[in-house]
């Protein structure tokens, strides 16, 4: 560098001196003027002492002046850094509030859904056998959750509005702190930030006016519980009657436990030799139906008719065999006309009356139908009734027409066959009164069937009543839960467009270390800078980060009330951390909770299945949109983007230099600084910690949600 400098000096003096001297006087080289020019610095190709000294002086002058210039520019940059810090700090307050408001909204909605999920599961549990002891408690717990949600929503609405009122001040205060934090021993920085716009357009009416009434749910659930209990009792009676009918038909699979001659199935197998296909067995009354017994009886009597033979060769034995065949034929005819119809709304039946005694025969067609041959004996003076034309008495007499038993009741009997109403009544009298007879168990089946039909029809009536109560309960549930599908709160706080920060610094003089004989001290006057920041979504954050941390804090805070919340916190927590896709989370949870109850059979089971589908449909019909849970982080931007943004109330801000000069140095009161910028703010929140809302706990106590006003960092706290 020195070599180049000397060469430049040499060229300068050479041109200056030689150009002036040579044309006028043509002096010889080495004259006085030549020596006092270039030769003072260069002689015989070498540098002189004078030239070296000049170079050193020039270099030192340049060095110290450059250092002073660099120091001056750095001080100007420091002011911009202070303004940037204020802008980012102010925007961070808005970001923290936005996060807090989102968490509150998520908490209220998810808490409401948790309550309805518990209520809906409880309503279904009322109808599930085995789950009814806890069903009432589940409904009551769900109602308490809804009441908790109502109180939480009201307090949160008031808290959020109060914070928004103070938000411009909080933005200014945080920015003032950030700017002042740049102070050094020699420089003081003063500044603040303005929230743009200053006014709020948030709408919390959806929270404030969203109290959900659960009175109808409570009333209908009580009615449903009573109807379900009555239906449960009726179903038990129906099941008992059905089991008695089943025992009479085919409950004799265990002879050692029930008896040797235990049921129709066993008697049909022993007496009629029916195959397993013709004579099916059912091990349980659950899978058995009464129609099985009717079909078994039809098959049995057809086979007995086909197998019937006289037990001896006498006319009396023949008469008894004919009487049995007549009874079998009559039974088949009657059974063909019998039925049991259960259409799911009413059960009706027709079961034949099979006579067991002579007296009962007189009430049937066996007594009145003219189907028995007659004859006259003793010259036509004696009329007798016979079992058939094969009777010796009939053959020995004169054949007559057919007659009924009633026509000859009380007359003289045929001495050969002695056929009369007693013969018919006696045909099955013993089997009907002792357990080794098929008819004995058939009569047991008929008695049980009559009880079963009566119980079943009563069950149908109670089932309709329970269905009506379930419908009322589902309607009450549907109407109540619709409150959650209303418009969500609109979060549009002051500063939603961004913040504009102003910063000024005090006068400063270069430090002594930079002052010397080669330069004069530099005095910098007051400097100012302006900056702006906006909020940008952070795609790198997981959607449930904030809510997961928030709920973890709540769980820690609720640890002292273990046993009060039971599974409520689990249900709420799952919905809360799934708030990003709240509808999907609610649908999935509702399905799992109802399916977790297990299925139920019978009348209650079908109603429970219907109610479960209806409740799940009500939840699905909410149609809740997915939520954007990305964190908002402050980023610097051009001040014009904020000042001239739509809705800006500082769009008329002009003469920025004048505004900067109006900031009083050393002032740390955010309100005073804002007033200097013609921007009005009010400190509406006092103290260092502000309670945003309180979550009441079932059974007493609450969890406060607080805002740390002192630091304004991570605005939401779980009671800490």
Can you annotate each of these PLM segments?
Residues 383-384, 406-410:
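Residue-level signal for mature regions of secreted extracellular proteins and peptides
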Residues 408-422:
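Repeat-associated, polar segments at repeat-unit boundaries in modular proteins
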Residues 379, 391-407:
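Short, intrinsically disordered, charge-biased short linear motifs at domain edges
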Residues 4-121:
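Alpha-helical assembly-interface signal, strongest on the long, hydrophobic N-terminal helix that forms
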Residues 99, 103, 388-392, 401:
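General detector of folded, globular domains
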Residues 106-385, 390-393, 418-720:
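Long, compositionally biased low-complexity segments
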């Amino acid at each position: 560098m020195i070599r180049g400098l000397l060469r430049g000096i040499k060229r300068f003096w050479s041109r200056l001196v030689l150009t002036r001297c040579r044309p006028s006087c043509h002096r010889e080289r080495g004259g006085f003027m030549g020596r006092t020019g270039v030769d003072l610095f260069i002689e015989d190709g070498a540098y002189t002492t004078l030239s070296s000294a000049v170079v050193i002086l020039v270099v030192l002058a340049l060095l110290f002046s450059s250092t002073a210039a660099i120091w001056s520019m750095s001080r100007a940059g420091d002011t911009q850094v202070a303004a940037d810090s204020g802008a980012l700090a102010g925007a961070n307050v808005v970001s923290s509030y936005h996060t807090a408001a989102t968490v509150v909204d998520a908490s209220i909605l998810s808490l409401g859904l948790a309550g309805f999920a518990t209520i809906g599961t409880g309503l279904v549990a009322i109808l599930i056998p085995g789950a009814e002891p806890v069903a009432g408690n589940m409904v009551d717990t769900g109602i308490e959750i809804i009441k908790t949600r109502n109180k939480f929503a009201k307090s949160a609405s008031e808290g959020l509005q109060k914070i928004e009122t103070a938000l411009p001040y909080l933005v200014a205060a945080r920015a003032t702190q950030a700017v002042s934090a740049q102070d050094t021993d020699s420089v003081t920085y003063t500044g603040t930030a303005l929230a743009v716009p200053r006014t709020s357009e948030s709408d919390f009416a959806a929270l404030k006016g969203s109290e959900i009434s659960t009175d109808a749910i409570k009333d209908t659930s009580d009615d449903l519980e009573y109807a379900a209990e009555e239906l449960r009792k009726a179903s038990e009676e129906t099941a008992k009657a059905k089991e008695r009918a089943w025992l009479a038909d085919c409950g004799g699979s265990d002879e050692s436990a029930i008896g040797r001659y235990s049921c129709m199935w066993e008697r049909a197998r022993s007496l009629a030799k029916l195959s397993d296909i013709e004579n099916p067995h059912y091990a349980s009354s659950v899978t058995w139906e009464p129609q099985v017994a009717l079909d078994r009886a039809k098959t049995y009597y057809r086979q007995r008719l086909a197998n019937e033979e006289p037990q001896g060769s006498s006319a009396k034995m023949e008469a008894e065999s004919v009487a049995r065949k007549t009874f079998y034929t009559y039974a088949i005819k009657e059974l063909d006309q019998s039925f049991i119809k259960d259409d799911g709304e009413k059960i009706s039946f027709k079961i034949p009356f099979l006579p067991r005694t002579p007296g009962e025969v007189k009430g049937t067609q066996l007594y009145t139908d003219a189907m028995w041959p007659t004859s006259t004996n003793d010259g036509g003076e004696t009329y007798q009734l016979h079992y058939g034309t094969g009777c010796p008495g009939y053959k020995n007499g004169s054949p007559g027409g057919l007659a009924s038993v009633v026509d000859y009741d009380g007359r003289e009997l045929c001495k050969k066959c002695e056929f009369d109403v007693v013969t018919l009544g006696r045909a099955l009298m013993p089997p009907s009164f002792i357990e080794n007879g098929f008819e004995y168990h058939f009569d047991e089946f008929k008695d049980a069937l009559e009880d079963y039909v009566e119980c079943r029809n009563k069950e149908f009536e109670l089932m309709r009543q329970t269905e009506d109560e379930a419908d009322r309960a589902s309607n009450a549930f549907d109407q109540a839960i619709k409150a959650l599908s209303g418009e969500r709160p609109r979060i549009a706080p002051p500063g939603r467009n961004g913040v504009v920060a102003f910063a000024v610094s005090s006068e400063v003089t270069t430090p002594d270390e930079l002052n010397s004989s080669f330069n004069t001290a530099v005095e910098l006057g007051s400097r100012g800078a302006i900056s702006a920041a906006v909020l940008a979504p952070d795609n790198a954050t997981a959607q449930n980060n904030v809510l997961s941390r928030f709920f973890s804090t709540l769980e820690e805070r609720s640890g002292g009330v273990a046993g009060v919340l039971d599974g409520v916190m689990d249900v709420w927590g799952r919905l809360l951390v799934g708030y990003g896709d709240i509808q999907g989370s609610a649908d999935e949870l509702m399905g799992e909770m109802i399916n977790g109850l297990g299925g139920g059979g019978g009348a209650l089971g079908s109603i429970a299945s219907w109610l479960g589908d209806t409740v799940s449909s009500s939840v699905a019909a909410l149609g809740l949109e997915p939520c954007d849970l990305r964190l908002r982080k402050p980023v610097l931007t051009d001040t014009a983007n904020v000042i001239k943004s739509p809705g800006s109330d500082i769009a008329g801000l002009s003469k920025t230099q004048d505004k900067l000069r109006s900031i009083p140095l050393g002032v740390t009161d955010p309100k005073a600084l804002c007033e200097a910028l013609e921007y009005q703010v009010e400190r509406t929140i006092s103290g260092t910690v502000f309670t945003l809302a309180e979550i009441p706990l079932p059974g007493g106590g609450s969890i406060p949600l607080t805002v740390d006003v002192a630091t304004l960092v991570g605005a939401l706290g779980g009671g800490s």
